[in-house]
């Protein structure tokens, strides 16, 4: 039985742990930070469109930190690390994915050496998110694969230990390196362990990079715009200069720029997805993740969703006027959030940013 550690106990992470637990093909551990005491004592209250209402639910093991999960007396090593935290590469150093998973990789190496391959599944947004892992953990020192998880799920933590899931869980899982046979096998195994027939929808993804560029049509154009204005998508569409102005003047140009950047990388994204993403969000009164993060005063996944694609565009000579406006404005919003958290300091006497 595979041992799986899920890191991130928000709406996505808890439903991920629940789905694995219900399938009964893995031993599931969950890192629960802020809600640890509450969940340890009372478990989770979950209202799920896939699984119904659960009271007092817990996975097989819960830990208050990744370090505790790695150093637990009964830790025999984890076969899978599933990362569902936000990917904030411009945030505090200790929140970078490589630093989050390091204690587990180090412990696995100590316990098993080269005999255990750790499969790192990144259920996160953005493009080029795998490169940090490959850069920080040399293959000659660590034995691991890196897997991609692209999840569409309307799941939110609405209170301490309280999860609401309103959209069916759709997960596609594949290997970032399409030539890595071990990663491909691990992705297929995870699909099997995660699939609860008739409840969630899970599939193996043979074209990870294509899928990630495709999802960026939504994230880079729609998710970002809602964060700037603090509105759900239907209101963005209805509150425009006219009924078509937001999609025609903002959403669609941004999406076409993503298509052009992807094409410069040899990835062809069909134009029909522009209409598809607009239409499926038109009647969903649901605030996307960046909008929610901004309203909660939390840092947004700005760099992996907008920064990385724009850097690729500059490298490949692709014009991105709409994306660049969105990005530069959101950099200011992100800086405001950082200042409130004490991550940036502004000297009002000199009207300059203080270097630390």
From Swiss-Prot:
Give the source species.
Saccharomyces cerevisiae (strain ATCC 204508 / S288c)
Q: Where in the cell is it found?
A: Cytoplasm; Nucleus
Keywords (A to Z) from UniProt: Cytoplasm, Nucleus
Name the SUPFAM superfamilies for this protein. 6-phosphogluconate dehydrogenase C-terminal domain-like (SSF48179), NAD(P)-binding Rossmann-fold domains (SSF51735)
Enumerate the Pfam families for this protein.
Answer: ApbA (PF02558), ApbA_C (PF08546)
Further notes on this entry?
Present with 5171 molecules/cell in log phase SD medium.
Q: Which PANTHER family match?
A: 2-DEHYDROPANTOATE 2-REDUCTASE-RELATED (PTHR21708:SF30), PROBABLE 2-DEHYDROPANTOATE 2-REDUCTASE (PTHR21708)
**Chief place where the protein resides:** cytoplasm
| Protein name as catalogued | Uncharacterized protein YDL144C
GO cellular component annotations of the record: cytoplasm; nucleus
